[in-house]
Amino acid sequence: MRMRHKPWADDYLAENSHIVISEPSQYKGKWHSVFGNDNPIHIEVGTGKGQFISGMALQNPDVNYIGIELFKSVIVTAVDKVKQTEAPNVKLLNINANMLSDVFADGEVDRVYLNFSDPWPKKRHEKRRLTNHAFLKKYEQVLGGKGAIHFKTDNRGLFEYSLTSFSEYGLVLTFVSLDLHQSDFEGNVMTEYEEKFAAKGQPIYRVEAEWRT
């Protein structure tokens, strides 16, 4: 999908540096000090327009949330969502997911959320899928070999690929749903994409995968 350029995005992010952390690598190993507490840190890789992470922050004030989004044209909307909720326990990073280990120390993160990631269906693009082994290794590092990944998608092919990838990597699947909205799962916070898919009656797939020490 082509992202529409927003020439004012840089200035807007700079004006909201209390939400979008510039030069986040300087806080590696120090993220608890950024939030001013020792609460668990959960990250969302590909936070998009911010509805999920803002909703989670409101629902769970005792958890610190960090949303990671590569595209400035998208993260500016996430900034607006965070400002609207006035949630003090959420920060945003305008970085590539490949930089996780540059930004977080080993074991500094407690959970990783992946919501409606780009499926990259062509085989030659497999390395770009956020659930391939290369990315799992990055998550494992910042999670310190513990914690969990919570993954949601509307794409059956990506879901099946991810289940296999998680299992082959040695993760334990503790929750699997082939139709989340028809399950008894409680506390679900929907993304913008999820609302659209649900309105069309499309099933939402969800899995929780854990590292066991």
UniProtKB/Swiss-Prot annotation:
Residues 124-129 are annotated as: Interaction with RNA. Pathway: tRNA modification; N(7)-methylguanine-tRNA biosynthesis. One of its GO terms (cellular component) is tRNA methyltransferase complex. It catalyses: guanosine(46) in tRNA + S-adenosyl-L-methionine = N(7)-methylguanosine(46) in tRNA + S-adenosyl-L-homocysteine. It is an enzyme of class 2 (transferase). Its EC number is 2.1.1.33. Keywords: Methyltransferase, S-adenosyl-L-methionine, Transferase, tRNA processing. The active site is at 118. Substrate binds at residues 122, 154, 191-194. S-adenosyl-L-methionine binds at residues 44, 69, 96, 118. SUPFAM superfamilies: S-adenosyl-L-methionine-dependent methyltransferases (SSF53335). GO terms for molecular function: tRNA (guanine(46)-N7)-methyltransferase activity. Belongs to the class I-like SAM-binding methyltransferase superfamily. TrmB family. Catalyzes the formation of N(7)-methylguanine at position 46 (m7G46) in tRNA. This is tRNA (guanine-N(7)-)-methyltransferase. The gene is trmB.
